[in-house]
Structure formats: structure tokens, C-alpha cells
């Protein structure tokens, strides 16, 4: 399972890292904010023209309201903007499956958690 997933990922193309200064003249179809900036209500120093047309933006942070990164993505017309709540639930479901052999339905859990976050927010 993991080896097949890794091979499929490698077939998509090369993966490389860089600093914020190296992003100025590049466009991306997918931008994942895995920095700690959202924990502090801050926005990473992103170039204005970072997103390709229809790009997806994903913030690992989740909460009752959109993060600064998510608001930035919406202002820059990202095709899709998501937070990390789905990843949290899906990782828990995958762990439950590995431990118990049962794959829980995640959509109702995500919906319930989203409602609870909105109540508290």
C-alpha cells in the first residue's frame, strides 16, 4: 500500500524545497501551509502572484474561522480553499482502521466537528 502510493507520488514529478525569496517568479497549482504562522494568526510572507489559475490552497491549521492564509487564498482567487480538519479526521480514521480493521465513515464526523467549531467560534 505505502510503496504503491509513494510510486504514484513520484510519478507526478520532482519535489523540491526552497525559501520564500525563491517563490517570487513561480506559480503553483497546490499550496499547503504547514508553517506555524496560522497558530499565531499570521500570514507567511507569500508573493502576490504565487497561485496558478484555479490553484488549491490547504492550511494544516483548522478552527471556527478562516485562517489568514485561507483568507489570503480567497483574495487571490484560489480554486479551492480548505483547512486541516479533514486531515485530522482522516488520519484518525486510518489509524482506527489499522488498529481495529474497521474504516469509520468520516463525513459525519467532519460535519459534526465543523458544527461544534462554529458554535464555539
Residues covered by each model-derived region:
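A short helix-to-beta-strand connector/capping loop
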Residues: 10-16, 77-79
Amino acid at each position: 500500500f505505502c510503496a504503491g502510493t509513494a510510486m504514484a507520488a513520484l510519478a507526478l514529478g520532482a519535489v523540491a524545497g526552497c525559501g520564500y525569496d525563491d517563490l517570487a517568479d513561480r506559480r503553483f497549482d497546490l499550496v499547503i501551509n504547514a508553517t506555524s504562522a496560522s497558530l499565531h494568526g499570521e500570514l507567511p510572507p507569500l508573493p502576490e502572484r504565487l497561485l496558478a489559475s484555479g490553484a488549491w490552497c490547504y492550511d494544516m491549521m483548522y478552527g471556527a474561522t478562516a485562517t489568514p492564509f485561507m483568507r489570503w487564498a480567497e483574495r487571490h482567487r484560489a480554486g479551492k480553499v480548505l483547512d486541516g480538519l479533514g486531515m485530522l479526521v482522516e488520519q484518525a480514521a486510518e489509524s482506527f482502521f489499522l488498529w481495529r480493521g474497521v474504516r469509520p465513515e468520516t463525513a459525519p464526523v467532519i460535519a459534526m466537528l465543523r458544527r461544534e467549531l462554529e458554535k464555539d467560534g
